[in-house]
Amino acid sequence: MKFGVLRFPGSCDEVDALHAARRVGDAELLWHRERDLKGVDAIVVPGGFSYGDYLRAGAIARFSPVMESVIAFANGGGLVLGICNGFQVLCEARLLPGALLPNANLRFTFRQVQLEVVEHDTAFTRAHDGGRLSIPAKHSWGRYYADEPTLTAMQEHGQIVLRYAKGENFNGSLDDIAGVRNEQGNVFGLMPHPEHAVDELTGSTDGLCIFASMRMAVEGARV
Amino acid sequence: MKARVLIRPKAGILDPQGEAVQRALPALGFEGVANVHIGRLVELDVDDASQLEPMCEKLLANPLVEDYEIVLNQ
């Protein structure tokens, strides 16, 4: 199975995402001006500050050539993971519901966060063996918001996949939401960084299960 | 044609920037200030003013969380 990791001007976590994806499969970088997704089985939209995050985080990246292809890929059922800035890009592209706003504390905040897995049977969490995830978060625009009708629909369809554990919601996200998927279940975004938690050297390997789940989903679909 | 687009957080959405400024004003002796909200101003020259609304919907604002107001200077 092969992951394609997008690279925008201003991306800064694409190399770690590539490294994490290579722990469970093959992976290559896809440049923002390319429309060709090179036959990859899943897409990772990485963290960073795409196009400088001018105007709003993720607002300009969503109109890049590669994102046109990613939107078509997602609409065709392809697996897409958005991490941090990637989550913002997917929300701006309307592949995921809601929006990300400046942190309630108005600060760029970097800390290890504890996450509760709310939905276990998803293409992005199926390889998780239970318990909380300990994953770093680092952002200034991570306050998740969706209006009331959207939130109700998300709850009905099991779209809230991850929540910050009690006391961990430093950015002021609505209902402690840390990660959401689309209604079809093939697009997932989260603010914390699973790609930075794949090696004991950095304190946690809890992020690996996200990538391993995606591999299971792709290979299960092939059988 | 010159145009201005005023973009502000939708009512009811937490606006921590506005709150921080509102808290700072009384400390400087400015009393009786309420409902401080902070948004963005986009100034632009356009040939066709009818394009402004789709511009706002697609890029200048995020209609899920922001209201926008178009002001034309003929």
Question: Which residues does each predicted region cover?
Answer:
Chain B
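Long, contiguous binding/interaction regions
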Residues: 2-41, 47, 53-74
